[in-house]
Amino acid sequence: MHISTTTAPQGGKLPFYRHLYFQVIVAIIGGILLGHFYPQTGEALKPLGDAFIKLVKMVIAPVIFLTVATGIAGMSDLKKVGRVAGKAMIYFLCFSTLALVVGMLVSNILQPGAGMHINPATLDGKAVASYAQQAHDSTITGFLMNIIPDTIVGAFAKGDILQVLFFSVLFGLALAMVGDLGKPVTNFLQALTAPVFKLVAILMKAAPIGAFGAMAFTIGKYGIGSIANLAFLIGTFYLTSLLFVLVVLGGVARYNGFSILALIRYIKEELLLVLGTSSSEAALPGLMAKMERAGCKRSVVGLVIPTGYSFNLDGTNIYMTLAALFIAQATDIQLSLGDQILLLLVAMLSSKGAAGITGAGFITLAATLSVVPSVPVAGMALILGIDRFMSECRALTNFIGNAVATVVVARWENELDQTQFRAAMAGELPEEIDVVAEPVPTAA
């Protein structure tokens, strides 16, 4: 089944002003202007962005459940579930670690914090105390135990991605194992997919409003001028993320037979939504629909993307090591090679608990610094004011990384329709594909 969130008029393509990406661009520009010239009004528009993100979160759990459960139920070889998950985790581990190393290398080369000579004792630790407390409350054991929900209803009520994914995988396996007895349930879930994704399409029409409110609030509250003093750090992070996407992920894409720029062009509407809301979670349903439409099998999409939202956060990983070394440089703390290796190892573990929501990267950084004694947690006060401006880049890089991972794993598993994928990358797919609920064959 393929889902489109765009409706084309009969007899031709959509006019440019009706494309979601154009509307979101206009909304972002409008939000920046309003927040800059009327900051108080901009701050007051925060509920618009918050409301849109809540609307999207409302449907994330059903989308994941339906996609994963029906995808696994239709697998004839249940061993493939473990194989897909295993390959995805290997991919995540390799490229998440590479992102951490890239951030560390760039920070050592460009030294964005050098010359600031900040005395850590003069920093206001209270400003980051809440983030440090949240980080302190998070442990690896607690994170792993939290994947198992207390109740099925609780997982859906909280909208916890990993808990919903955990139950969905088990339920899909159970459906496949009961064979024909589970076929009516599978067909019902398949039919239910159509209205749920139609609901997603309806909610996406509010994306420009959400992006406008979120951007107006960001500029109104923090101001464009607030980034001037730390512009070098922001520029370094954006440049590093761009190079990671174009060179590292671009190389992975080329090795697997597609262009990273073509993929970015294909998911441009979702990327603009991430840019406007600073949350990759806001575009999760759209990404899942787009990747399935591009020819990736539902079983792969359903396993890779939701898992990647916790285990494949390239942008967050670049930010963590880059920001940690920036704080050390700014406070004149010399980190030995051993200190940096310790920082890398701790970051490899703490980054796995980061979620795709705004501010999660900052909390994860606090978790890392609280374990590494050499770098003061209070130093995070230096970047607290500009973190919001780096959040967009983190979310965009995370999002592109998960899109690439989905294609790569699908190709490894021979679960990628090459003809359909090439058409998607060339922009040759029709603008509207009817949503049809087709029965999914169950495993015997």
UniProtKB/Swiss-Prot annotation:
Keyword field: Cell inner membrane, Cell membrane, Membrane, Symport, Transmembrane, Transmembrane helix, Transport
What is one Gene Ontology biological process annotated in the Swiss-Prot or TrEMBL record?
L-aspartate transmembrane transport
Q: Does the keyword Transcription regulation apply?
A: no
For this protein, the record's InterPro entries field holds:
C4_dicarb_transport, Na-dicarboxylate_symporter, Na-dicarboxylate_symporter_CS, Na:dicarbo_symporter_sf
User: One cellular component GO annotation, for this chain's record?
Assistant: plasma membrane
This protein's membrane topology, according to the annotation, is:
Multi-pass membrane protein
Q: What is its main location?
A: membrane
In terms of Pfam families, this protein maps to:
SDF (PF00375)
Q: Which PROSITE patterns match?
A: NA_DICARBOXYL_SYMP_1 (PS00713), NA_DICARBOXYL_SYMP_2 (PS00714)
Gene3D superfamilies given in the database record:
Sodium:dicarboxylate symporter (1.10.3860.10)
PANTHER family (alphabetical): AEROBIC C4-DICARBOXYLATE TRANSPORT PROTEIN, PROTON/GLUTAMATE-ASPARTATE SYMPORTER
Report the family membership: Belongs to the dicarboxylate/amino acid:cation symporter (DAACS) (TC 2.A.23) family.
What's its job? Responsible for the transport of dicarboxylates such as succinate, fumarate, and malate from the periplasm across the membrane.
Official protein name in the record? C4-dicarboxylate transport protein
In the UniProt record, the gene name given for this protein reads dctA
